A protein has these predicted regions:
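Conserved "landmark" site that anchors the functional core of diverse proteins
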Residues: 1-238
Length: 238
């Protein structure tokens, strides 16, 4: 929508959105969860290019659908670059989120002719089926555990963040032992008590629990829009 570079930083907003005053003119676009955004108290839509003037106030209201919203401005947010990234991640960066009253640098754009001014919603909140592939230790599962994974719905527990998601439901307990091995975003680990832990974008890179499933990139994106109490089902692909 904004023709930004893939490395230009966006703002991820979880559950509750901020109130922002723009000190320069620019263009913005909002995707992901619908948090009832307004510009100068006038409702605006997700998945559109919005012209912003100096002094305009952007505010987010009630969360209608989804869990995470993404706000982009033309040219991206100019946060400090650490290890080739503008993301916040303690302890590599001093902050892990924005604080009230902070100022964030953006570039001024008076003129911009977008190739498209709006697009069909790409929101994933209404999907509840998550595609996953068999993980390296999938074969250690017994028939009952496999049956539960394929047929049971799993409710997102309160323990969920950018590092990992957990579910209320469990599968069979096990005593499988393995060496610490590599993990990726989307790796589904199984604890000895039968609890499933799905590593997310800021998840650890190694782990000692069996890696029974691996989510697709789309599966990770779908799960990231789920909040506590939402449910999902796995579709296990060969």
């Amino acid at each position: 929508l904004l023709n930004n570079d893939v490395k230009d930083a966006v703002m991820e907003i979880t559950m509750t959105g901020p109130k922002m005053v723009f000190n320069v003119s620019t263009y913005l676009s909002i995707t992901g969860a619908d948090m009832s955004p307004t510009l100068n108290d006038n409702p605006i839509n997700n998945y559109e290019v919005i012209k912003v003037q100096e002094g305009d106030i952007l505010q987010f209201g009630k969360l209608k659908t989804g869990f995470r919203t993404y706000l982009a401005v033309k040219g991206g947010f100019r946060t400090a670059v650490k290890l080739g990234s503008r993301s916040f991640y303690k302890p590599i960066t001093s902050l892990n989120c924005l604080k009230d009253g902070m100022e964030i640098e953006i570039s001024e754009f008076q003129l911009f002719e977008p190739k498209i001014t709006q697009m069909k919603s790409q929101s994933l909140h209404h999907f509840d089926e998550i595609i996953a592939y068999r993980g390296p230790e999938f074969s250690m599962l017994n028939k009952e555990s496999v049956k539960k994974l394929k047929s049971q719905r799993f409710i997102v527990a309160k323990e969920n963040n950018r590092m990992a998601y957990q579910f209320i439901e469990t599968i069979e307990e096990h005593n499988y032992e393995m060496l610490t091995s590599a993990t990726l975003p989307g790796t589904v680990q199984l604890t000895p008590s039968g609890k499933l832990i799905i590593l997310m974008s800021d998840g650890q890179t190694t782990g000692g629990y069996p890696r029974i499933l691996q989510l697709t990139k789309r599966g990770i994106a779908v799960l990231a829009q789920k909040r506590s109490g939402d449910s999902i089902a796995f579709k296990i692909s060969n």
